[in-house]
Amino acid sequence: MSEPDVKSHKIEFPCDDYPIKVIGDTVVGFKDMVIEVLSKHAKVDLSTLAERQSKEGKYTTVQLHIVAESENQLHDINSALRATGIVKMVL
């Protein structure tokens, strides 16, 4: 029996249009904090910025695209966002 042809979904770096979704507590300045942290680590495309609140308003989601240079860079971004204490998830 042959194995199915499964294609790997690896990221090829640099990736000029890498989507980032950041979910965190709804607090004043959340969007600006996300942009500030991302801007320290990558070129941010603000034209792709989208912000949404959960139905009850407890959480906010900020989505945008960055230029991703490496896996290490993505790890650093994740760590920096999580270190804020208000970010719950980075996708």
UniProtKB/Swiss-Prot annotation:
Gene3D superfamilies: 3.30.70.260
UniProt GO cellular component terms: cytosol
Pfam families: DUF493 (PF04359)
InterPro entries recorded: UPF0250_YbeD-like (IPR007454), YbeD-like_sf (IPR027471)
Stated family: Belongs to the UPF0250 family.
Matches recorded under HAMAP family: UPF0250
Record protein name field: UPF0250 protein PP_4802
Native source organism of the sequence: Pseudomonas putida (strain ATCC 47054 / DSM 6125 / CFBP 8728 / NCIMB 11950 / KT2440)
Lineage, uppermost ranks: Bacteria, Pseudomonadati, Pseudomonadota, Gammaproteobacteria, Pseudomonadales
